[in-house]
Structures are given as structure tokens and as C-alpha cells.
Amino acid sequence: MDFEELKGVLREINEKVLQREWAEALGTEEKREAFAVRWSPSRALAYANVVAELCRRGEEEEWSVLPSSDEEAQKTMKAVCFGGNAAEAMAFAALLRYLRPSAAGKPQTELDEGSLPEKSQSHLDMTVIDSADWKPVLDKLLSATTTPPLLSKYASASARASNHALLSPSSLTLTFQQHDILAMTAKQVIDTVGNKPCLTTFFLTLGNLYNLSIPKTTAFMYKLDAVLAVGSIILIIDVIGSSVPSPSAATADPESEEAKPYTLSWLLDRVLLGKPAEKVPTQGRGKKVVEEEEANKPVVRWEKIVAEDMKINKLDEKLRYPGSLENVKFQVLAYRRV
């Protein structure tokens, strides 16, 4: 795909994205491919670094994001990416190669010899969910990830011997589901995340969902809260300072608390941490009323393990890509089911 030929459609996509008109921005396969070529590489590098950092932190604090030790090498890692697309697929493919060297593809010479592939379970079971149909793009990415690059017929023997795919075909299971996330039923959510610990991501997605509907997004997060297994992690990467207008902002005093926008952290804390958890004032109130309010407070089943208002994924200046690469700035939130 010639990057120069994409500039016209990229301008159109960018205009629609800035207006939050996602259906128009990504309404055709051509637009989705162009979006993947232009914006996904920078995002994928940022996403992979965030998850890798979370993995390292988990090892230090003795909890697991995605099992990576030699003893756990036979376990299948599980990731569910809500609002995901090509960037998530790129990020997790790179992360899998980093965490599991055994997931690497075989050299082209071995494949040419016709040796039978070893039967093994998948290292990573990944599900991507979005309202746009990313399946054709993801299928192409998966094929490119698990197939050795094409070499010239004049390539040297050493070049052929060292030519291998990023991943072996059996190492990654990538499934795409096309859903309106906020319309997913409880059964669909359960069937998607399963009953074992998994990493659930919302990369540059949750702020958009909350801006569409606070009640519907809150209800969806409660569905996740109800079904995610102990040890699961919800990881959010979003725009720095991403906020959601208060429903009462239009009628409230501009200087009042009611008029202030909600932050993602505040909205998620209320769902997952049961906040606000301030002590109930008892003065002038009956003991029974106070006891009932205390009893009705939600049980806290999550711990907040990451809260970074600003993070920058700074790229090496020597890194080159035919399209364009940028340093990505974002905020990170992560919650662990306990």
C-alpha cells in the first residue's frame, strides 16, 4: 500500500475522528486499512510498552498480568480488547514475542524442508471487539505476523536461514467480534471473557463510551465487574485529561460542583471501588438508617494498581517507518480483581 496514495483518505478520516464521528471515519474497509497503516504503529508501540511494564510490576509484586515465567510457559494467556483494532493486534503480537521467545516462528529453511509443525496450544488467546468490522484487516495482520517475509530469489543462504515470522501460526489465536459494546448482553460478556483470569483492555475507547452514555457505560462496567474472575485486570489507556460532561452541567451554576466534568478515574472508582466511601454522618440520624446505608454500600472487589495522569511513549529517533511515527501521550488506569 503506497502511503502517498492514502493522504486524501487519511485527511477525511482525521476530520471525522476529531468530530467523534467514528462510523463515518471507519465506515469502509479502505478507511480501516488506511487508519491501521497511519495511526496503529505508534499506538501499538505505546500499548505494548504499557502492558510490558505492567507485567514487570506484577512480577515484582507477585501478581500476574499475563503469565511469562518458564514454569507457566504452557499456560494460555487471555486478553479481551474492547474497542480494539489493528493497534491492539500489533501490540499483543510484539508483547507475545517478548514474553515468550518460544512463540517465535521457525526459520524459512525449516519450513522449506517441509518439517511438520509441532502441535502445541496457543500461547495467547486474544479477542478484539468493536462496532466496526475489523476482521479483514486483522486477518491480514495475523497472516503477516505468522508468515516469514518474502525474500528476493537472489537472497543469500544466510538471509534465508535467518528469515522467520514474528510468531509461529499456533502461538496466537486471534478472534474478532463485531458488537455495539454498550448493547452487549450479560451472556455475551460472560461468553467473551470466560471464567478464568484475563487482561481486559479499553485503549482510547472508554472516554468515547462514557461520552456516548454515562448510564449505559456504567451498566456495562457493572457487567464486567460481575463476571471477571479473581486475578483479572482492567487496563485503560486514554487521552490525557479525558473527561465527561456532567448531565446537570447545562442547568447548574457554572461555578458549582455539579457543573464540573467527570474524570475517567472518578467514574471508574465509583463502579469498581464503591466510591464515594466517605463515612456516613450520624448526627441527627437514626441508628437504623445509618446501619442500612452502611450495609448497602457495595463490596469492594477491586484494587487500583495504576493511576498515571500523564505518560509519554518516547520513540527512539533512529526508528523508521514508511508512514509516520509519533511519541504518544496518554493516561493509564488499571484495576485488579481481588
Q: Could you tell me what each predicted segment is?
A:
Residues 91-94, 138-140:
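A short secondary-structure junction signal
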Residues 1, 107-124, 130-338:
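Domain-level detector for long C-terminal conserved domains
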Residues 15, 37, 41, 49, ...:
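Ordered, helix-dominated protein-protein interaction surfaces in large eukaryotic regulatory proteins
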Residues 73-76, 80-89, 128-131:
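Class I SAM-dependent methyltransferase "Motif I" SAM/SAH-binding loop
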Residues 1-26:
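N-terminal auxiliary segments of SAM/dcSAM-dependent transferases
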Residues 17-76, 87, 93-114, 245:
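Class I SAM-dependent methyltransferase Rossmann-like catalytic core
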Residues 5-8, 12, 30, 34-35, ...:
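Acidic, Ser/Thr-rich intrinsically disordered and amphipathic helical segments
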